[in-house]
């Protein structure tokens, strides 16, 4: 057994503890059940409230679903509850979907066009207060136009509309109005998916295979997900042999790399980590400070030391996976000397304690992170260390998720993004467009810097409304070029999501580009319905 070197002082102790545990022992069930540990809270299973927006919900199906097998590049979409891929009119403003026949929800009721209509209308209904409403602002109306046909009418051309059809469909009978967050679907979901939730506690959810699933009953018959929010605790329970798999940050995952009976799985993602630069904070709002901080961070060192090589440096929210829409020149080099010069030229001069000062105010601000997220903690501390080397004092503070968004106007936050990365529009729009800087628009994490850049707004809007692939790609390259000239965040890294699994004879795993979410709904288990064994 070989221990991975302690690449970060912040993670030294948990690595050593996990590395010295015993090899994996055989699971008692040895059959068709899996037990996984997740760091995300259980519940909130209503698609109208945003659950499974990227198509990962095992209790629901969308009209389309992701097709795996590509660990780089945008995955293809294929019909799910749609009988065939949606068909647009000439300007991509009207999309017609023929739905699949003979499908039933797990409560026994038949699936039909009325369920599709009810789900999407609920998102648009102000009474639902759906967090998805803003991201569906292109949807003008949805109606059934026949016994097996649904028509979506859009306010403007939107060529990536099929990505919006990954959302799970709920029965119309369950969508009776009122706040989405108060719907019974949050704790008792009813869908057409390959699994059915049979019990739910705060610390455990149990799913059983839907034996009447329209695409064939899954061979994994029972899935238990236990909620373990602490990274180190998940690693310890994984090492004890009580779990079949868990999501773990890279340094902890790597401690299992040379252990008998375990495998470390890394999936490419468009999930970024970065530091917000609040427009209402006089230090982080300064354009010179924003540029200097972007030049001062050693992203390569973060990838190697904190991600253990499982990731890539990020200067903008756009990863290389977008091909022609990616602008390779839009990067911030690591240049501490230039960063210091920019600050000096802008009037930020070193004070007696080494912290720069301008007009009597010190170059000091706070970066928040979620207390139980060791990866965000380590990145926050590395960012603070790099900033200190150019005379900027960054205080690092653990802040509970429940109050985190409310403090983002005054304090910076170590955030992640890439919730729906299957088109550049959904990767970028809510992060950079100024419409999300307005109070009450989107979630508290959308455009969390309150960033406003008219050039970027125009390019994002032009790309969103274009049906020409080459023109869209050019617009997105223009977004990146404009962004590095006037950054609104300090983007740090794109993650490879890391997981640990116990050896087994199950086959069928398929790599896929993952979104920001990386609980056990993704990883090796995203396509659990397809797993087979000899």
Pin down the residues of each PLM region.
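Aromatic- and charge-enriched surface segment that lines or borders ligand/interaction sites
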Residues: 84-128, 151, 283-285
């Amino acid at each position: 057994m070989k221990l991975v070197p302690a690449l970060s002082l912040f993670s030294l102790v948990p690595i050593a503890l996990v590395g010295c545990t015993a090899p994996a022992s055989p699971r008692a069930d040895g059959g068709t059940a899996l037990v996984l540990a997740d760091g995300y809270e259980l519940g909130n299973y209503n698609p109208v409230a945003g659950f499974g927006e990227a198509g990962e919900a095992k209790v629901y199906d969308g009209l389309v679903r992701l097709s795996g097998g590509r660990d780089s590049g945008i995955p293809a979409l294929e019909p799910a509850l749609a009988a065939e891929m949606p068909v647009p009119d000439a300007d991509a403003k009207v999309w017609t979907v023929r739905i699949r026949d003979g499908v039933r929800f797990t409560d026994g009721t038949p699936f039909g066009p009325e369920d599709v209509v009810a789900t999407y209308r609920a998102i648009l209904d102000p009474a639902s207060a759906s967090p998805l409403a803003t991201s569906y602002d292109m949807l003008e109306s949805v109606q059934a136009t026949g016994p097996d046909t649904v028509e979506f009418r859009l306010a403007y051309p939107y060529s990536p509309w099929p990505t919006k059809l990954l959302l799970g469909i709920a029965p119309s009978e369950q969508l009776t109005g009122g706040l989405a967050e108060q719907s019974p679907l949050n704790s008792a979901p009813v869908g057409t998916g390959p699994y059915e939730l049979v019990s739910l506690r705060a610390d455990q959810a149990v799913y059983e295979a839907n034996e009447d699933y329209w695409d064939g009953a899954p061979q994994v018959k029972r899935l238990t997900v236990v909620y373990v929010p602490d990274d180190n605790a998940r690693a310890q329970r994984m090492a004890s042999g009580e779990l079949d798999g868990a999501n773990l940050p890279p340094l902890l995952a790597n401690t299992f790399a040379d252990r008998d009976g375990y495998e470390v799985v890394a999936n490419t993602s468009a999930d970024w980590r970065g530091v917000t630069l609040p427009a209402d904070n006089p230090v982080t709002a300064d354009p010179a400070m924003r540029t200097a901080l972007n030049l001062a961070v050693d992203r390569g060192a973060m990838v190697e030391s904190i991600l253990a090589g499982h990731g890539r440096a990020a200067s903008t929210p756009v990863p290389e996976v977008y091909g022609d829409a990616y602008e390779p020149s839009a990067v911030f080099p690591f240049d501490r000397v230039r960063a210091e010069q920019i600050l000096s030229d802008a009037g930020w001069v070193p004070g007696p304690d080494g912290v720069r000062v301008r007009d009597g105010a010190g170059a000091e601000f706070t970066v928040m992170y979620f207390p139980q997220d060791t990866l965000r903690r380590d990145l926050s501390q590395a960012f603070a260390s790099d900033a200190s080397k150019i005379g900027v004092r960054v205080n690092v503070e653990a802040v509970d998720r429940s109050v985190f968004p409310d403090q983002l106007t005054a304090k910076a936050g170590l955030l992640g993004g890439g919730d729906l990365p299957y088109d550049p529009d959904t990767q970028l729009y809510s992060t950079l467009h100024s419409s999300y800087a307005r109070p009450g628009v989107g979630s508290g994490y959308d455009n969390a810097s309150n960033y406003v850049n008219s050039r970027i707004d125009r390019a994002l809007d032009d790309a969103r409304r274009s049906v020409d692939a080459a023109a869209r790609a050019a617009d997105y390259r223009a977004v990146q070029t404009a962004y590095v000239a006037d950054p609104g965040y300090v983007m740090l890294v794109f993650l490879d999501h890391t997981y640990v699994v116990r050896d087994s004879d199950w086959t069928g795993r398929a790599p896929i580009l993952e979104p920001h979410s990386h609980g056990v709904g993704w990883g090796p288990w995203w396509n659990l319905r397809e797993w087979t064994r000899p």
